[in-house]
A protein has these predicted regions:
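Hydrophobic beta-strand-centered segment that forms part of the acyl-chain substrate-binding groove
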Residues: 58-90, 95, 188-220, 224-225
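HotDog/MaoC-like acyl-thioester-processing domains
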Residues: 71, 82-148, 212-215, 224-253
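Intrinsic-disorder/low-complexity, polar/charged segments enriched in Ser/Thr/Lys/Arg/Asp/Glu/Gln
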Residues: 26-28, 75, 88-90, 104, ...
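Non-catalytic linker/capping segments at the edges of enzyme domains
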Residues: 1-30, 34-36, 124-172, 253
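Short solvent-exposed loop/turn micro-motifs enriched in small/polar/acidic residues
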Residues: 11-15, 100-102, 151-153, 200, ...
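Alpha-helical transmembrane segments of multi-pass membrane proteins, especially transporters
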Residues: 47-48, 74, 232
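Residue-level recognition of conserved beta-strand positions in structured domain cores
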Residues: 31, 168, 209, 232-234
């Protein structure tokens, strides 16, 4: 997953309501939460949506630090620590480390009235070693409106084949400009796999990106580790079942 110079026309991020502004090296803004961003039967926002927003918030900062090289996301976490059941969250992202080889970032999700931190995310980025992976100037501000009219997993095309087995086809709505599956889509895919396997809500995700889904479809397999933990693998089924992502999901049960 890489930082975007802008949100491509027709991509799912344009259908999520948020505003982002970067100044003095800090990425600030807010996320509008609608029912489409919640799991079925829950008042809480999806952990994978928080992971996606974290990648947008700090991926832009990492991209600016790596420019003109593309910043690639190596790993991404989202941990819900409070009530995320309102209709808005304020978001603050910053870089914790900017080294020669890696960049580490943190994102806080805060209650819009009290300012209390209700979710946390951390991400590690690296500049792409491929000379062709370059980006233009990154925007210091973005705004998009709520346009989802069905649950986000359904909108992204997630198909549940059996408990823990979910697939998503590549396509313009879910792809990066490079044609690979966008990393937030992979996080949603893994979250749905863990949900369908256990019947419980995900409250924490640890996502390790190993390779891009270049052919598709992306397909999951999931196993329970203990009463609260599910391990999910995401593979590129059209590319010799290449392992693309490993996810650890913590369940609320």
């Amino acid at each position: 997953m890489g930082a975007l110079a802008h949100t491509p026309e027709g991509m799912f991020l344009q259908d999520i309501g948020y505003t982002q502004d970067i100044s003095d090296g800090v990425s600030r803004g807010w996320l509008q939460i609608t029912d489409e961003l919640r799991p079925p039967g829950s008042s809480q926002v999806r952990a994978s949506v928080l992971a996606t927003m974290s990648d947008v918030w700090t991926g832009t900062l990492a991209g600016m630090a790596c420019a003109p090289k593309l910043a690639l996301t190596l790993d991404l976490t989202a941990r819900i620590v409070g009530d995320v059941g309102g209709d808005r969250l304020d978001i603050v992202g910053r870089l914790l480390k900017q080294g020669r080889t890696t960049i580490v970032a943190e994102t806080d999700f805060r209650h819009p009235v009290t300012g209390a931190v209700v979710a946390l995310s951390h991400a590690t980025f690296v500049a792409s070693p491929r000379p062709q992976d370059v980006v233009g100037p990154l925007s210091a501000g973005r705004t998009s409106g709520n346009a989802l009219n069905r649950p986000i997993a359904e909108a992204l095309g997630a198909q549940v084949l059996s408990p823990g087995v979910v697939l998503i086809e590549r396509g313009p709505y879910v792809n990066q400009p490079s044609g690979t599956l966008q990393g937030g889509v992979v996080a949603v895919l893994a979250e749905v796999a863990a949900e369908t396997l256990t019947g419980a809500r995900v409250v924490e995700l640890e996502v390790r990106y190993l390779s891009a889904v270049r052919v598709g479809p992306a397909c999951t397999s999931a196993v329970t580790i203990d009463d609260h933990t599910v391990r999910v693998e995401v593979r590129d089924a059209g590319n010799h079942d290449r392992l693309a992502t490993v996810v650890m999901a913590r369940m609320d049960r």
